[in-house]
UniProtKB/Swiss-Prot annotation:
Functions in the N-end rule pathway of protein degradation where it conjugates Leu, Phe and, less efficiently, Met from aminoacyl-tRNAs to the N-termini of proteins containing an N-terminal arginine or lysine. GO terms for biological process: protein catabolic process. Its EC number is 2.3.2.6. The keyword Cytoplasm applies. InterPro entries: Acyl_CoA_acyltransferase (IPR016181), Leu/Phe-tRNA_Trfase (IPR004616), Leu/Phe-tRNA_Trfase_C (IPR042203), Leu/Phe-tRNA_Trfase_N (IPR042221). This is Leucyl/phenylalanyl-tRNA--protein transferase. Keywords: Acyltransferase, Cytoplasm, Transferase. It is found in: Cytoplasm. It comes from Burkholderia vietnamiensis (strain G4 / LMG 22486).
Length: 254
């Protein structure tokens, strides 16, 4: 059994999350509230919400944790070709925080293999939009001919970014947004993007798992640092379109 949290109850230590032998590895707690203060506290502890309509708010801290180090981002030859085309063609834009709620709604509506419905409920959209208004959640959006065709959103504290979801209505549109974000974070010296759980898609882009203990320790350090600027555009992609496409790893603990 996982603990039920009343509004003033603190999170239990993440080490108490359910283990791999259970049906819900990483599940830590449940609650009825998704207040911004609760959400902020969760991220700073390496915890995130994930639940469906009709369920209580379920809080997770899996071990291991999937992350993407910007320095280890893999740019395939086909993606590099796409990014070069985006840089050349004025019809392509990458905008930051232009339509945050719209990106969230598009992510909610995007079909997911093996999933029915969405975990991005109206309650989730309201909570993360509140974080966006306070400067702690951002959207990176791919636009073509004046229409938003893909993007992603996530949470940011200090020098830590927590990726949440992405969508694409055009081929590679979400990858364009992710690549632009990665290029900006590399330029700012950020070492880690939280990806929460392992997927083959993330692994193909350079994502890997690290121990929860190492992840939480990194979050505590990075989130306490001054925030980075969140003004950039597709010109950041120039750093990824050279022959190498990836910088040397910066030594994140595994």
């Amino acid at each position: 059994m996982v603990p039920w949290l009343d509004p003033n109850d603190p999170f239990p230590p993440v080490e108490r999350a359910l283990g791999p032998a259970t049906g819900a590895p990483g599940l830590l707690a449940a609650s009825a509230d998704l207040l911004p203060s609760r959400l902020i506290d969760a991220y700073l502890r390496g915890i995130f919400p994930w639940y469906s309509d009709g369920q209580p708010v379920l809080w997770w801290s899996p071990d291991p944790r999937m992350i993407l180090a910007p320095a280890e981002f893999k740019v395939s030859p086909s993606l590099r070709k796409t990014l070069k085309r985006v840089l050349r063609d004025a019809a392509w834009e990458v905008r930051v925080d232009h339509d945050f709620a719209g990106v969230m709604r598009a992510c909610a509506q995007a079909p997911r293999r093996g999933q029915r419905g969405t975990w991005i409920t109206a309650e989730i959209i309201d909570a993360y939009t509140s974080l966006h208004r306070s400067g702690n959640a951002h959207s990176i959006e791919t636009w073509h001919d004046g229409r938003r065709v893909g993007g992603l959103y996530g949470v940011a504290f200090g020098r830590m970014f927590f990726g949440e979801s992405m969508y694409a209505d055009a081929t590679d549109a979400s990858k364009i947004a992710l690549a632009t974000l990665v290029a900006h974070l590399r330029d700012q010296g950020l070492e880690m993007i939280d990806c929460q759980q392992n997927t083959s898609h993330l692994a193909s882009l350079g994502g890997r798992e690290i121990a929860r203990k190492a992840f939480v320790a990194h979050v505590r350090r990075a989130a306490a640092e001054p925030p980075i600027p969140w003004q950039f555009d597709k010109r950041a992609l120039a750093a990824l379109t050279g022959p190498a496409g990836a910088a040397a790893p910066r030594g994140i603990e595994r």
